[in-house]
């Protein structure tokens, strides 16, 4: 029986802390708290309209993936991990992660509503799991490895790390290249905050695998899960580049193929496994971002002095209540 799944009938409160390392992970995640309305996307609208159509198509595919992916992550946390795991410090982490994933999901919805005014096109993106075969395939793969009736806790944690790491990482990289072009500051800011959060989520899964999981999956199983994730990313990249007619400034799909393999080898190291691909980093100029080392001070520098929202939709409008008279 896994320690993480054993009920302690004598423990009702979080204090005294019994698992200090897990508690430190929770406090780290707590320190990164932000809200979806704290990013100003007003300048992004003009940048988006000035962007070549092929480039916009590429980033639309990424947004279509993200609006689906975070919902599936939330689903796994609420229906599986948060019901099964009994170690309070770990449960606190996953409770905080679920809240963060809700912020991420809202943020991606705001991005779609801000950049894409046409409601039919918005709906096509929000329905990505139905409209894009590769996104549906990725969602099915995630649910397959998150199924507690078919996979051990260790296998599911490996799959979860692959989702938070491998499936998301190339999309983070692609958006971050917009910063080098000095465009889309709001989208880039969202990307930095979300990728930083996801980096902690992924690292925590690896920490649990290495330090708490008793029945650690065999290396061949870990490699199988990670390689399947890489193959899905390859398929998505090909699909997105086809939509963009092969033209995306800043990088080629071959560079993204190489990067995701470089990242996967680092994930292997974090899980104390042998590397699979043994390739170098094709984007050395962005190493700091790839290591999820966005400076925390930048988070506060990027916050607007007033909450702003460029979405022309009452359902997405944000109101800051200043006093009781506003209620």
Curated annotation (Swiss-Prot):
It comes from African swine fever virus (isolate Tick/South Africa/Pretoriuskop Pr4/1996) (ASFV). PROSITE patterns: RIBORED_SMALL (PS00368). The active site is at 108. Signal peptide: none annotated. Heterotetramer composed of a homodimer of the large subunit (R1) and a homodimer of the small subunit (R2). Larger multisubunit protein complex are also active, composed of (R1)n(R2)n. Its cofactor is Fe cation. Binds 2 iron ions per subunit. Induction: Expressed in the early phase of the viral replicative cycle. It catalyses: a 2'-deoxyribonucleoside 5'-diphosphate + [thioredoxin]-disulfide + H2O = a ribonucleoside 5'-diphosphate + [thioredoxin]-dithiol. The keyword Oxidoreductase applies. This is Ribonucleoside-diphosphate reductase small chain. Gene3D superfamilies: Ribonucleotide Reductase, subunit A. Keywords: Deoxyribonucleotide synthesis, Early protein, Iron, Metal-binding, Oxidoreductase. One of its GO terms (biological process) is deoxyribonucleotide biosynthetic process. Fe cation 1 binds at residues 70, 101, 104. It comes from the Viruses.
């Amino acid at each position: 029986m896994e320690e993480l799944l054993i009920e302690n009938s004598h423990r009702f409160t979080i204090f005294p802390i019994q698992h200090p390392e897990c508690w430190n992970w929770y406090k780290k995640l707590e320190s990164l708290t932000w809200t979806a309305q704290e990013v100003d996307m007003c300048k992004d609208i003009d940048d988006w309209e000035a962007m070549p159509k092929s480039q916009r198509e590429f980033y639309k595919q990424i947004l279509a993936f993200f609006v689906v992916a975070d919902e599936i992550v939330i689903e796994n946390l609420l229906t599986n991990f948060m019901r099964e795991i009994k170690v309070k410090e770990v449960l606190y982490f996953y409770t905080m992660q679920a809240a963060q994933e809700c912020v991420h999901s809202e943020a991606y919805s705001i991005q779609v509503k801000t950049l894409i005014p046409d409601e039919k096109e918005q709906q096509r993106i929000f329905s990505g799991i139905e409209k894009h075969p590769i996104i549906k395939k990725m969602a099915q793969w995630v649910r397959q490895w998150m199924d507690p009736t078919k996979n051990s806790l260790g296998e599911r944690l490996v799959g979860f790390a692959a989702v938070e790491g491998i499936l998301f990482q190339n999309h983070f990289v692609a958006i971050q290249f917009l910063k080098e072009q000095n465009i889309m500051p709001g989208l880039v800011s969202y990307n930095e905050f979300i990728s930083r959060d996801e980096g902690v989520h992924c690292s925590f899964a690896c920490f649990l695998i290495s330090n708490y999981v008793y029945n650690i999956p065999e290396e061949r199983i870990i490699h199988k899960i990670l390689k399947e994730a890489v193959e899905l990313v390859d398929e998505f990249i090909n699909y997105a580049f086809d939509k963009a007619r092969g033209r995306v400034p800043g990088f080629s799909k071959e560079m993204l193929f190489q990067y995701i393999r470089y990242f996967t080898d680092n994930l292997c190291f974090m899980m104390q496994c042998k590397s699979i691909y043994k390739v170098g980093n094709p984007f050395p100029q962005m190493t700091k971002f790839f290591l999820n080392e966005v400076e925390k001070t930048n988070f506060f520098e990027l916050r607007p002095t007033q909450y702003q929202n460029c979405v022309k939709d009452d359902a997405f409008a944000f109101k800051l209540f200043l006093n009781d008279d506003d209620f």
